Structures are given as C-alpha cells and as structure tokens.
UniProtKB/Swiss-Prot annotation:
GO terms for cellular component: large ribosomal subunit. It comes from the Bacteria. Belongs to the universal ribosomal protein uL10 family. This is Large ribosomal subunit protein uL10. The lineage of its organism: Bacteria, Bacillati, Bacillota, Bacilli, Bacillales. InterPro entries: Ribosomal_uL10, Ribosomal_uL10-like_sf, Ribosomal_uL10_bac, Ribosomal_uL10_bac_type, Ribosomal_uL10_CS_bac. CDD domains: Ribosomal_L10 (cd05797). It holds the Pfam family Ribosomal_L10.
Length: 166
C-alpha cells in the first residue's frame, strides 16, 4: 500500500510542477468525443507545443493546492483533461477553442493563466487573440507606419521639386 501512496505523491508532484511551469492551462471535459476526434485534438495540440493529459480530479486538486492555484475545485468534476503550454500563453486556448467550435462535445471548463483561474468564456476570448508572433508583427507594422508615411512624403516632395525644376 505504501508503494501506491508514494506513486500518487509522485504524480501530484509531477502535476504541480506542470501547473507551476505552464504559462497557460485549459481544463476541458472530453466526454462525447470519439477516439478519432481525441486523436485529432491531441495531434493539433502537439503541433502547437501544448501538452494534453487526463488526470484524476483528486490528483489535480492536490497538485493545484501545492502549486498555489486556488479556485479550481469547482471545475474538477466529471472527466477532466488538461492542456498546458509552457511557451505560448495563447496556444492551448487557441487550439482548444477552435476544436470546440467544430466539436460541440468538447466542453471548456476553465483555465489558468499565469497562476490565475479564468472562466470558460475568458479561455475562448484568449483563444481568439493572435499568437505572440502575430501580436509582435502587428506592433511592428503600427510602429513602422509613421516612418513609412514620412518617407513617402519626403519622396513626393523630392519628385515635386524635380518637376518644378525642369
């Protein structure tokens, strides 16, 4: 019996470490999905660099407590799978939200962003945001626009002066 308890403690430590190291976590109820659909979801998540695992609710509850995450208890009922991303804060929410639109059986329960519990609606909102790279490119284009417009204005003035000099 002691070996079983040690294995459970080790699993709780592993889950707590995953929760602590992830920048975003999405908790879903996968009930009603076929094996093919779950396999498809797993492959999409893997491509996005997101880890997807099914854990017992009691183990997740203890791990969340150990990781200092409060407020998850109410969402840990029924079959629960957890998608975590340690790199991109938007990746897990984006893939899960997109998959949930096409497959109504996948229910988003809640999520955790940087240690704070968020609702299913907030997960969907985060999922609709562009990725980090997309946001950076948007910012760069906004910063580049005034310089580009100034260059066009200088070029137009130069062309205008050339025409008047002729």
């Amino acid at each position: 019996m002691s070996a079983i308890i040690e294995a459970k403690k080790q699993l709780v430590d592993e889950i707590a470490e995953v929760l602590s190291n992830s920048v975003s976590t999405v908790i879903v109820d996968y009930r009603g999905l076929t094996v093919a659909e779950v396999t498809d979801l797993r492959s999409q998540l893997r491509e996005a660099g997101v880890e997807y695992k099914v854990y017992k609710n009691t183990m997740v509850r203890r791990a969340a407590e150990k990781a200092g995450i409060e407020g998850l208890d109410e969402f840990l009922t029924g079959p629960t799978a957890i998608a975590t991303s340690s790199e991109d804060a938007v990746a897990a929410a984006k893939v899960i939200s997109g998959f949930a639109k096409d497959h109504e059986a996948l229910e988003i329960k809640s999520g955790v962003m940087e240690g704070n519990v968020i609702t299913a609606e907030e997960v969907k909102t985060v999922g609709s945001l562009p990725s980090h790279d997309g946001l950076v490119s948007m910012l760069l284009s906004v910063l580049q626009a005034p310089v580009r417009n100034f260059a066009y204005a200088v070029k137009a003035i130069g062309e205008q002066k050339e025409e008047s000099a002729e």
